């Protein structure tokens, strides 16, 4: 999978629009300022380091987050239809949690988490187009994301903290203390974490199906061929329309970002 420059730009505008529409007051401004500060990094981030995972290509992170936001709002309606207690959280908390659920993947203020893999063998044999940046101290994705928010003065509610912390559900052993409880007083007192987890799970699954099901059916060559590095742009995209790309690039203020996207 490879996104064009205009697709990446459109996804970024949608990402910012979600903040403007759903995050109110001073916190909304703080969140916009935070993401604009790290725009050149976040706009090209992959959602994962390995192409067998979901959206492991430039721009994959923002596309994934947008999908999780949209899915969260749809799944909210389903839960409401089945008589969920809507009074336990707000739509703003829902969207804030979805937007920031994977924020920890950006790394720290100085260094990005995912950098291009330098080991050819690992790229070709293990499908690792990216590797983890050793300059970034270890932290789980939820912990780092919450730290980044608070270190930039962006406040979050208990509901939002719990949801970001547990968005991987019981796939993450660390979440058992919150989700694997039997006593009523120990269970989450809102359905918000379950909605965002289901949205994230569905988004990742859809992204897997889009990338891999046609290939596994043999429509695009053998699996050995599919192990080749393709997500970082080794396969040219002949469908690009220069005029559309030029229009997308012309709307950007950052010369550095224009240069990066122009090479896609």
Per-segment meaning from a language model:
Residues 32-90:
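A glycine-rich, hydrophobic loop/mini-helix early in the fold
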Residues 54-57, 63, 75, 81, ...:
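Divalent metal-dependent catalytic cores for phosphoryl transfer on phosphate-bearing substrates
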Residues 227, 241, 245:
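Intrinsically disordered, low-complexity mixed-charge segments
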Residues 229-236:
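Extracellular secretome segments
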Residues 245-264:
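Short linear clamp-binding motif
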């Amino acid at each position: 999978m490879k996104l064009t420059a205009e697709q990446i730009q459109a996804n970024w505008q949608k990402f910012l629009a979600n903040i403007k529409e759903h995050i109110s007051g001073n916190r909304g401004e703080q969140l916009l300022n935070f993401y604009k500060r790290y725009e050149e990094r976040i706009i090209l981030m992959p959602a994962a380091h390995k192409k067998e995972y979901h959206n492991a290509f430039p721009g994959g992170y923002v596309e994934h987050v947008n999908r999780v936001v949209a899915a969260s709002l749809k799944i909210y309606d389903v839960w409401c239809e089945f008589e969920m207690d809507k009074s336990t959280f707000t739509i703003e908390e829902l969207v804030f949690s979805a937007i920031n659920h994977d924020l920890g993947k950006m790394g720290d203020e100085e260094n990005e988490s995912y950098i291009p893999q330098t080991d050819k063998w690992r790229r070709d044999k293990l499908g690792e187009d990216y590797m983890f940046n050793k300059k970034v101290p270890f932290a789980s994705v939820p912990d780092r994301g919450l730290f980044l928010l608070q270190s930039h003065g962006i406040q979050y509610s208990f509901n939002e903290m719990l949801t970001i912390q547990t968005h991987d559900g019981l796939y993450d052993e660390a979440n058992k203390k919150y989700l694997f409880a039997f006593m009523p007083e120990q269970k989450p007192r809102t359905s918000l974490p379950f909605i965002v987890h289901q949205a994230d799970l569905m988004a990742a699954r859809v992204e897997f199906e889009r990338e891999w099901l046609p290939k596994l059916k043999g429509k695009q060559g053998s699996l050995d061929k599919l192990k080749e590095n393709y997500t970082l742009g080794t396969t040219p995209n002949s469908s690009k329309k220069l005029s559309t790309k030029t229009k997308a690039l012309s709307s950007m203020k950052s010369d550095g970002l224009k240069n990066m996207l122009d090479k896609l």
